[in-house]
Amino acid sequence: NKNNGFLQENFIRTFGQITRINGNLGIDGKMNNFGQLSVVDGDLWFSNHVYQEYLESVYPLKKVVGNLNLKNTHACLSSLEEVGGNLNLRKTTCYDLSSLVKVGGNILLSKSQSHNYDFSKTEIAGTIKMFNDEFSQRKLTSR
């Protein structure tokens, strides 16, 4: 039985000294940085209705055991090495996946952004799925 966390509003802007979350984590507020967080032992998702204007990177995050939903975020993913489930990159400008070795599920992309990604060094257990998303770079889009 996993523990679940949900960060709401703007009370927490960093994970500070926390290195691991043992469970699922949902973020519904604006983050500044990931502090020392390197592993999430469950799903990690960002709310689809909050634009992460201050979060420039998820560094030092290396592993998400479950699904990782980064829809409507634009943070650098250069430290990310493994996602155990699906990786949702729809409506993002998260193009630097240079450390990503493995995705245990599907990768979801906005069709208009797909040419910006290189998955040649990534083992993908599922498939790459494309979506016809309305997309405005560095802005929250509803559809």
Language-model features and meaning:
Residues 2, 23-33, 42-55, 66-76, ...:
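Concave beta-strand-loop units of leucine-rich repeat
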Residues 130, 142-143:
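Extracellular/surface-exposed low-complexity segments
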Residues 10-19, 31-38, 53-62, 74-81, ...:
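Short, T/G/N/S-enriched strand-turn elements that build extracellular solenoid repeat scaffolds
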